[in-house]
């Protein structure tokens, strides 16, 4: 008989907003843990500041708090809920750091809360670089020469004994924040300063660099009985020196000898035992490729990004098992839900190869530093599974959804052999393509391996792909050659390009030959036992393990890798859609390739296919599922997967696939500028003057006709990619010359830029009625991307006459488009007139936020509409949903510290990676919470630097007075200080422009003499460059930096209005009329 759990109620700490280094993997692990705890009859309480997560849905826990993740807020929740246990190892670095802080503040002892799973001492010993080093020496594990430093002087003394290159690793940080590789003493000084600032305990480890060694990871689990197992070992294709989150990785390892494998496995088990970790843990090793010498690099004493990958790669539900171990279960008494027959103590086995490739944001940040090092830069990742490494690699490349859809892409600079050699030596996001380019030129695998540090085994595998490219380009396309190419993962599109024909012709030839993929099971046991999970991947073999589902079914297209502009919000929508289909008796088939997310969990849908989200792969799955008595091709839902899914709609419709919801013609109408202009004109709804243009001449003529400034953007993009506000003709010419805006062949949209209040509506349409759950008002004026704006629900200061106009326009547009399901419309209120900016006939990134604050389960309702149920059938009616007795603010969260060379200035191109929410009874309290949750709160009474553009100075006077009233001494650049003093505002310190005196503006930031920066960008060359350096310095020192006066004024308003005295309550309590204070 199973023993009673250690506790009857548990508080789970979430990881907060999505940032580089801490992404959707913690929504996945937290959601799994909450389900596992509920299975055990335990009362669950979740706290997270991120409204876009599945884990903060009200049905996920007994009490759901969307509140700032601070010690003070957590203590209030603990005092109210009185949990017996705290589970912090599923909330990433945020969860771990908060657990340590709660313990050190005496909160856990004061309320009798037990820290579950990994003990506090084990967390400290793994995270504190000095304690970890001492532990490794105690157990006889090899340790690199290193020094735990608390100052630059410490580090420089170490550099005298061990010269650069040196690695700098800050303690208690995520994604290598603040760290890096120092190749000189000057670089060492910069990195140590940055690392000490990033570490919550002001500590960095400085160690000898092992550049070029192999990086190997083991995912290990241990229970309270000291039973330990390895789940998976992972090999980084990139050698040491590149953060594992930025490395291409392969599971299981491909180049280790059995002796090396067993040696590192034994070391991993010894380390997890010595630390006393209970649950999951990730251990990273460096292995000398020329000997069996290894070093332990670090341990993550928690579920991590690698755990999510290992989980999806093996099918073993690590987070679920870790949660059960934390409450006292042991591995030998927990059934493996994947097989239903083995226990969790049974080590997984793989009979396939898994490849993960990171998704970097350099398509958004063309001027960002593409070099990869020990500080992570990727926003997301894709996973591909196949029977061989070559096929899995090619699938993963296709899944990235970049312009480089295969390995044939080359940078034109690589025509120069020295540039190609440089591209191999220096790790960047493009190095994989450089390897293929070098092999095409006849460079030997050994030479390429020596230059790049990538093992020869992997280089030879890429050489086999290059050889197949050459055969496909030159030989007759026989059935045997096509079969071989498909076995190696070549897409129809790539084969067509190599043979200068069309993808459709290759597909027709392939299908005529009867060449189609079969689908294999991911079962944790290499088919040793029958599996119960419906989790499949495609491969070109003979035996199929996935008979088509023989029941009513629908396919949900997921959102692919997390990237700026398309984040976790769309995974939320996909999962909620699958759940709604399941409840309606329709089998939900999920297609996605993101290993971090809930949607690729083995039980998030009735059937999961891990596949690239391109037309070929999706159509192959649909054809496979079509051979059922219920339908020809199963219907597909594209409105929940962001732009990824919408961009597939045209190809799917052309192939005869039934699309549930808004049809393809309406999707095209919303994206086609000329059609959309006519459409709104016929409805009598205003929009900013503009046009879709296809040439430079048309662009210049349109801009002159409507008048500068203009907003310029490509069509069919998400997140405002390559969008810009342009003020002058020469600026427009430069933009069109450098952005590649005309490259897609689709029109570039040019609109008059209207400087007004931006408003946003998400609505539900069943073809007869339109429900508007809520209207959101952006704090920043139009011109700042909606994803980077603070959004407020309800639009608290919008006159009712404009509310009525918004609801009327939304209703007319949705009905005229014949929309079905969700639709998102963005408006601008300019000089008393409401204009339509854009219409998106799909789910938007605000759907999770609005669903949670209004109580309308928008994705569930939309899915039921797609299945034929009207709003009335579901108990809703058209019009504006009753306003809730609360105010909620969605705040953008940025990861700029990780991206050198990228400006934090807000504009029409989206830059934020995640979001946080503040919710309360008043606007000021909700706003103050949003700033706190987003990490933008300025330390009370600390000096604030003001450096304002000329056209912002007059508006900055009131802001400066507000800051003074709050007790913030003012520091200002010369022009701003002069203006403020002339208007009676005292400035404590005037600083010179960069390089024009002492102290200058950079010095006060770099020396942390200010704790907040408000810098609005000017438009002449000098101030543009100075502003960039000011903003970068603030970000790299971890100092809150605001670039919009609207945002800064909102912060001051919140604090002056008493926003710091906010309430803390479960989410549903805010929607009741009675205020419950805690």
Swiss-Prot record:
Region of interest (Allosteric domain), ranges: 936-1078
Keyword Ligase: yes
Enzyme class: ligase
One GO CC annotation: cytoplasm
Cofactor note: Binds 4 Mg(2+) or Mn(2+) ions per subunit.
Binding site for Mg(2+) 3: 826, 838
Molecular function GO terms recorded: ATP binding; carbamoyl-phosphate synthase (ammonia) activity; carbamoyl-phosphate synthase (glutamine-hydrolyzing) activity; metal ion binding
Residues holding Mg(2+) 1: 284, 298
Binding site for Mg(2+) 4: 838, 840
Binding site for Mn(2+) 2: 298, 300
Residue sites binding ATP 2 per the record: 713, 752, 754, 758, 783-786, 826, 838
Segments of this protein annotated with the region Carbamoyl phosphate synthetic domain: 547-935
Binding site residues for Mn(2+) 3: 826, 838
Binding positions (Mn(2+) 1): 284, 298
Alphabetized PROSITE patterns for the sequence: ATP_GRASP (PS50975), CPSASE_1 (PS00866), CPSASE_2 (PS00867), MGS (PS51855)
Domain MGS-like intervals: 936-1078
Catalytic activity: hydrogencarbonate + L-glutamine + 2 ATP + H2O = carbamoyl phosphate + L-glutamate + 2 ADP + phosphate + 2 H(+)
E.C. designation(s): 6.3.4.16, 6.3.5.5
Function according to Swiss-Prot or TrEMBL: Large subunit of the glutamine-dependent carbamoyl phosphate synthetase (CPSase). CPSase catalyzes the formation of carbamoyl phosphate from the ammonia moiety of glutamine, carbonate, and phosphate donated by ATP, constituting the first step of 2 biosynthetic pathways, one leading to arginine and/or urea and the other to pyrimidine nucleotides.
Complexes and interactors: Composed of two chains; the small (or glutamine) chain promotes the hydrolysis of glutamine to ammonia, which is used by the large (or ammonia) chain to synthesize carbamoyl phosphate. Tetramer of heterodimers (alpha,beta)4.
Protein name, UniProt field: Carbamoyl phosphate synthase large chain
Native species: Thermomicrobium roseum (strain ATCC 27502 / DSM 5159 / P-2)
